[in-house]
Amino acid sequence: FGEVWIAGGQSNMEWTLAKAAEAADWAKKEHTGKVRFFVSVDSGSDTPQDDAAGYWLTAVSWDAAQLCSAIGYMFAYNLSDTLGIPVGIVNTAQGGSRFCTWIGQDTTAANPDFADYVTAQVQPRADDGTWDALHRFYNSRIHPMRGYQAAGILWYQGETDIERGNGDVLRRGIPLLVRDWSTVFGDGENLLPFLSVQIASFSYRNDYLQGTGYTGGLNGTAVPNGNFLMNQGVEEINRAYGKALSVPIYDVE
């Protein structure tokens, strides 16, 4: 027996353990196969799919572990060690993906204000083509797993939206995504634990953030089972620029 967590977002979540700053330390650890990954690979879909494309990784050695999501593997490894059970990660993340691609049709239909906001404010700033289409990766990577029971959700996404001045989509949308995915992977009544990493705002010009709602939006009321980890990389900024100031992005209770 064991438990499975769903990992989602963009390239931050895809970033492999081999590229992590602590890779050398993790290479020395014992990798016993108690951490297992399913990694989604597809280009999205305009319509909901029944089957998911991907591949399996069982971390029986460093050679396998280093190919896994750094965040996902570290989380699963430590959780497995604490609970004494195998832990699986379904990594659905896609580099460069926008938030609106991860929401399902039923959710946008039930929340027309959010759908109207995406149509009016988000889609006009999207790249040409279908990569940024509403529901795109939900259709191909989340919908096929409906009914599968998961223990919780790991989330790391936001750069693509912030870079295009759409930070408010996160404030508006994350509570909807938590309920959406909790319906897919939970019991249909209770919200799953939702663990999210805030993006490091020092990477973006101030005018990307001003007026977006990104800097003030989420709190414990909006996401009752949510836990938002601030990632400002202060030590790294200090090394690069000589000084840094850490300011919370979200006001989390």
Language model region names:
Residues F1-E253:
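Cell-envelope and extracellular/periplasmic
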